[in-house]
Amino acid sequence: MIFTSTPPAPPPADAQQRQPRYPGEDTTPTSRREIWGWYTYGIAAEVFAVCGVGSFLPLTLEQLARERGTLLSSHLPCVGPGSPSAAPGNGTTPAMLRRDGLGSDQCVVGLFGLQINTASFAMYTFSLAVLVQALTLISFSALADYEKNRKTLLLTFGLIGSVSSMLFVFISPRLYILGAILVVIGVTCLGSSFVVLNSFLPVLVANDPSIQTARKTEGEELPHLDSSGEYTRSGSFNRGDNRGFDDYVAPEHGLKPKTTDSTSPEMQLSTKISSKGVGLGYCAAVLVQVLSILLLFTLSKTSLPKISGTLPLRFVLLLVGIWWFSFTVVTRRWLRNRPGPPLDTSKGGARWRIWLRLVGFAWKSLWKTVKVAAKLREVVIFLIAWFLLSDAMATVSGTAILFARTELKMSTTAVGLLSITATLSGMTGAFLWPVVSRRLKLKSNHTIMLCIALFEIIPLYGMLAYIPLVKKWGVIGLQQPWEIFPLGIVHGLVSGGLSSYCRSFFGVLIPPGSEAAFYALYAATDKGSSFIGPAVVGVLIDATGQVRSGFFFIAVLIVLPIPLIWMVNAEKGRQEGLAMAEMLEKSHGENSSEFGHPSEEAEGLLARNP
């Protein structure tokens, strides 16, 4: 069984071992094998994030609904022998190479008594998936910090998520609703597992032999990582630079500014491990994406597409699920349990009642953080901007894939190549923007504004096709399939910069000592907003019958954060954060928590979410 414990490898004979901070803590020095166990889960799940969520799941959902749908005007099947778009020659053109639905009529499917555009169906599904993911992340954030729940939840989410992807091979067009349910499950497990995975990194760093040696040399104790968000921040599974996070440290007792500009050994090691994990995950995703395209091309030469146009896509999702499952098993063997503090059962009651109290504690803690943040003007302005911007980023990705398939009539293999283009550009952007910022001597908020301005090019370019003269040309304004590839490069480059610099800029505004709690709020804002945009675009598609109409909403959504980011005064926000930290420190002993130290309040694992 996947959850059966594997005897851990013995630690090196000369390894330094620190004192445990609570009963049952595993302070065994971190081994290279354990770090690779951490890497392997990123290699496993990032494939589903890029190849599944970012590419083939939206296409599969839309195609499943399309094969079940009818044309709005004539009620004829959207695809198949009886459809107006049936290919000549008895429809022998391979489905993966065919541009389905060449007519302009809207393809709709019945759902709860309503006629919904098949592209809207995919957008609504992902909107619901992100909402469920956000609720799950917040609810499980406190529970995963205790006992062996961390590894158990990681393996559980990985197992359920990978199986949900593999089960798509059995989802025929007749069961398209069940396909939507599997998407919700898969997306929820993906985000939740990454949050739990990130919570391992501070523990691995804390027990690394090199850190113990450095601390012994300096004559210092290792800070309590649970009461400081610093290592949580550097350990986040982010996609870029974390500069600006380490201006202050929060020791176990009291707050103090750093007395040195040098980066701490923990920060250096954490950043090194995190960056390598991100790189390995992206490389795995690109590899599987290439394999998926080859698989699609090979299957297009067989009779499978004649059975169902979605069958090759479903085989790709089977491959993705097998990959996720296989590397999760490796993670289970190589990654130690690293249990957290034991649950307090002194008050009696069943364990499930304690778990319910932990869920309530997570929500209550998040609300307390909201009340503190509401008193910080610069934080409020930035979070409003981030609310809009993160929603725009999530909406553009899903809309672009569906636009390429339904409006540009691109084949599935071409859409896969588009995804690879955006992924490689995102990897480049993570390294490029720090260089651009240094060369142009830009402040962090100016870099963010520049990224947003470039991001705005995508919807504006798509809206050019509404100009009659441009429409008459038949090119420019995303009228030809090749035009979307340069925009895919722009999307990748900009996303890499925004994800890193927004997180870094927010770090300057946080009260020292409350980092993890505020990053929980940051992540909740991200996940809590990302379901709105896809739902609105889905409504617009239903109203107009065109995915292109969503560009109007996206253009407004992208441009709104620019004045807000410009309004944020980083220095003033930093001073407000310091003042708030002093105020919180004075009331430190008055706000003790039922499940942990006062300084741990509102942290949870959600703080480690990218």
From Swiss-Prot:
GO terms for cellular component: vacuolar membrane. It is found in: Vacuole membrane. It holds the Pfam family ATG22. CDD domains: MFS_Atg22_like (cd17483). Glycans are attached at residues 90, 445, 591. Residues 1-29, 216-242, 586-610 are annotated as: Disordered. It comes from the Eukaryota. Belongs to the ATG22 family. This is Autophagy-related protein 22-1. It comes from Aspergillus clavatus (strain ATCC 1007 / CBS 513.65 / DSM 816 / NCTC 3887 / NRRL 1 / QM 1276 / 107). The lineage of its organism: Eukaryota, Fungi, Dikarya, Ascomycota, Pezizomycotina.
